[in-house]
UniProtKB/Swiss-Prot annotation:
Changing residue 164 to A: Impairs binding to HLA-E. GO terms for biological process: adaptive immune response; cell surface receptor signaling pathway; natural killer cell mediated immunity; negative regulation of natural killer cell mediated cytotoxicity; negative regulation of T cell mediated cytotoxicity; positive regulation of natural killer cell mediated cytotoxicity; regulation of natural killer cell activation; stimulatory C-type lectin receptor signaling pathway. This is Natural killer cells antigen CD94. The chain crosses the membrane at residues 11-31. Immune receptor involved in self-nonself discrimination. In complex with KLRC1 or KLRC2 on cytotoxic and regulatory lymphocyte subsets, recognizes non-classical major histocompatibility (MHC) class Ib molecule HLA-E loaded with self-peptides derived from the signal sequence of classical MHC class Ia and non-classical MHC class Ib molecules. Enables cytotoxic cells to monitor the expression of MHC class I molecules in healthy cells and to tolerate self. Primarily functions as a ligand binding subunit as it lacks the capacity to signal. Signal peptide: none annotated. The gene is KLRD1. Expressed in NK cell subsets (at protein level). Expressed in memory/effector CD8-positive alpha-beta T cell subsets (at protein level). Expressed in melanoma-specific cytotoxic T cell clones (at protein level). Expressed in terminally differentiated cytotoxic gamma-delta T cells (at protein level). KLRD1-KLRC1 and KLRD1-KLRC2 are differentially expressed in NK and T cell populations, with only minor subsets expressing both receptor complexes (at protein level).
Amino acid sequence: MAVFKTTLWRLISGTLGIICLSLMSTLGILLKNSFTKLSIEPAFTPGPNIELQKDSDCCSCQEKWVGYRCNCYFISSEQKTWNESRHLCASQKSSLLQLQNTDELDFMSSSQQFYWIGLSYSEEHTAWLWENGSALSQYLFPSFETFNTKNCIAYNPNGNALDESCEDKNRYICKQQLI
């Protein structure tokens, strides 16, 4: 009888040991995957006190796009000419960024990069126009009159704009308006 109890005890403790090892292994794998996902950083850092929208009622964006104030933004990490950037945005059913106001990109306020935006000079209208044909509001870029009309406009989320040859390569921002 004593031999039977010892054998049964060893069988139970061995089984519990194997179950414990399996649970520990599973926990280790889950923790490793969790830390790997956390270490992936986006191409920009959101500013303080700004909540990015993810799958909210008014904003559901594609993968690699950022939802903010019911718009979706694609912030490129690769550099392209202005026309290449424009075509890439159009292929994603969006357009190069058209700014509504200077705080539209608050979520990118820590970025120092310049990005192509959808602003170009129209010889026909003798005015700076956004891709949708609307005119530029002068309050967006107070020193705008110094820009060369043969160039394209690059914008920094800190509110700076500069004109560069359209053949230069910059990162770009695509925007999809959802509402």
